[in-house]
């Protein structure tokens, strides 16, 4: 549950003293939160158990009353997930974390933990399309108002806050617009108004590039599906409690932490928000991160530093190369001095500038779509943060349902291509781009996307599964 207090070994029922905490980030990725397994497993075991045995009736009562932390039921407590939570809390500089089923679940659980019917919250307009839809539609269905701020000016965030506002939400680097807001300035606004600042740090890669809590952010969320897992195999989300917001100073605004039945602030202090997420919201909604998924994410974390170093190196080189290519109209990369938020990148990012580049082709919408279809190795998909290079044409996919005015305000132009640079040999990435550029110049449209090796078309897949007659009409 927490970095400071761990009350579970492999069976979840014994206290373990904190004997050694690795100091360096790269070492923490492999060892933080791991405790000896009674069977000697070197890897974090997968505890695929729905429930966990109580030592006694009294022990069960202590666990359910949260007077002792331990494993109860895998909907909201599991030893494998617990290791992931501890590791990510430590990497982000927080005091506790809550693992959930996906990045979208992390958003919903966070909103539900802090708001109720009639409340509102403020969000940057520059957020992931899925998050925007959750805030604009799902929150509205729950009787909660989201107030979007389109500018970068902290004063505009301040102007949107009233006595029913429960938090401000932003992204470290916005997806896909590559906008970087001034975390410290917005944090000052929030704390002056008595509300926490929440940051989606998915692009910050679990603290490798950015640790928002070091800059005044109170709560961090991730889509762990992306760079944390790093291989496109597992969906998951994480919520990290920075332990920095004083819920005790604002009992009227946040009564859920002062309910006389649970007394979260009185009992758990700096960890009150994480406890509410895990033992109240997650318990009641069941947005559960499974033990196998948690182990997959832990395996991914072990190589995160090595991957992110290569991601950043490749991205910087590809951005420079694209900028010189005649067919490319523009390039948006926060590591370049001409990016409008480059100073923010220098202030808040370390070890590199991430691995996401946006660029546009001369020829607009059609050229962008044709380019994506012509690629042979690079994969067209909605995902990000994979070890493999991924690409997307947002205007025809993730942002297709938005109006042209909305897309323009979000910086999603018709020609925009979002590129998540992988860790392949950069010569191969360039070679695939070059052959696709040539097809765009020739105006040649590929009806079926080629791939390295043989691919099965849908009728071939059906035939393999059901026999030749099953796919004939």
Curated annotation (Swiss-Prot):
The keyword Transferase applies. Keywords: Alkaloid metabolism, Pyridoxal phosphate, Transferase. Transmembrane segments: none annotated. One of its GO terms (biological process) is cysteine biosynthetic process from serine. It comes from the Eukaryota. Disruption phenotype: Significantly decreases loline-alkaloid production. Loline alkaloids show broad-spectrum anti-insect activity, and different lolines may have different biological activities. In vitro tests of NFL, NAL, NML, and semisynthetic loline derivatives with long carbon-chain acylations on the 1-amine have shown that many are effective against both fall armyworm larvae and European corn borer larvae, but the effects seem to differ depending on the modifications. N-Formylloline reduces the weight gain of fall armyworms by deterring feeding, and does not significantly affect corn borers. It is an enzyme of class 2 (transferase). Signal peptide: none annotated. Sulfhydrylase-like protein; part of the gene cluster that mediates the biosynthesis of loline alkaloids, potent insecticidal agents composed of a pyrrolizidine ring system and an uncommon ether bridge linking carbons 2 and 7. Lolines are structurally differentiated by the various modifications of the L-amino group and include norloline, loline, N-methylloline, N-acetylloline, N-acetylnorloline, and N-formylloline. This is Sulfhydrylase-like protein lolC2. It comes from Epichloe uncinata.
């Amino acid at each position: 549950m927490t970095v400071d207090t761990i009350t579970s070994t492999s069976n979840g029922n014994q206290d373990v003293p904190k004997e050694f905490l690795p100091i360096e980030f790269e070492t923490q990725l492999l060892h933080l939160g791991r405790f000896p397994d009674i069977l000697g497993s070197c890897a974090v075991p997968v505890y695929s158990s729905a429930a966990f045995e109580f030592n006694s009736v009294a022990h069960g009562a202590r666990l359910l009353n949260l007077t002792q932390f331990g494993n109860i039921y895998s909907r909201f407590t599991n030893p494998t997930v617990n290791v992931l939570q501890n590791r990510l809390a430590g990497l982000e500089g927080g005091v506790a974390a809550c693992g959930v089923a996906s990045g979208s679940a992390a958003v919903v659980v966070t909103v539900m933990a802090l708001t109720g019917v009639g409340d509102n919250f403020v969000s940057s307009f520059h957020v992931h399309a899925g998050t925007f839809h959750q805030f604009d539609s799902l929150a509205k269905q729950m009787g909660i108002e989201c107030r979007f701020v389109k500018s970068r000016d902290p004063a505009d965030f301040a102007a949107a806050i009233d006595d029913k506002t429960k938090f401000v939400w932003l992204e470290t680097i916005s997806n896909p617009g590559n906008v970087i807001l001034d975390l410290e300035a917005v944090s000052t606004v929030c704390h002056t108004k008595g509300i926490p600042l929440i940051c989606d740090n998915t692009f910050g890669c679990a603290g490798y590039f950015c640790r928002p809590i070091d800059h005044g952010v109170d709560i961090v969320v991730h889509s762990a599906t992306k760079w944390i897992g790093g291989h496109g195999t597992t969906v998951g989300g994480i919520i990290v409690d920075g332990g920095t917001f004083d819920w005790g100073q604002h009992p009227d605004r946040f009564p859920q932490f002062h309910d006389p039945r649970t007394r979260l602030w009185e009992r758990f202090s700096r960890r009150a928000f994480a406890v509410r997420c895990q033992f109240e919201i997650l318990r009641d909604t069941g947005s559960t991160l499974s033990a196998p998924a948690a182990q997959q994410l832990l395996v991914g974390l072990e190589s995160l530093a090595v991957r992110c170093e290569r991601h950043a190196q490749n991205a910087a080189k590809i951005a420079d190369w694209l900028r010189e290519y005649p067919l490319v109209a523009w390039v948006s990369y926060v590591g370049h001095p001409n990016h409008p938020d480059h100073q923010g990148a220098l202030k808040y990012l370390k070890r590199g500038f991430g691995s996401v580049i946006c660029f546009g082709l001369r020829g607009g919408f059609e050229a962008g779509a044709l380019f994506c279809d012509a690629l042979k190795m690079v994969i067209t998909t909605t995902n990000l943060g994979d070890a493999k290079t991924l690409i997307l044409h947002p205007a025809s996919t993730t942002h297709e349902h938005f109006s042209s005015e909305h897309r323009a305000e979000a910086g999603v132009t018709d020609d925009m291509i979002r590129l998540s640079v992988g860790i392949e040999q950069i010569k191969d990435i360039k070679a695939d781009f070059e052959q696709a550029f040539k097809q765009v110049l020739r105006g040649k449209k590929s009806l079926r996307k080629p791939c390295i090796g043989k691919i099965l078309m849908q009728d071939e897949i059906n035939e393999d599964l059901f026999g030749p007659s099953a796919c004939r009409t």
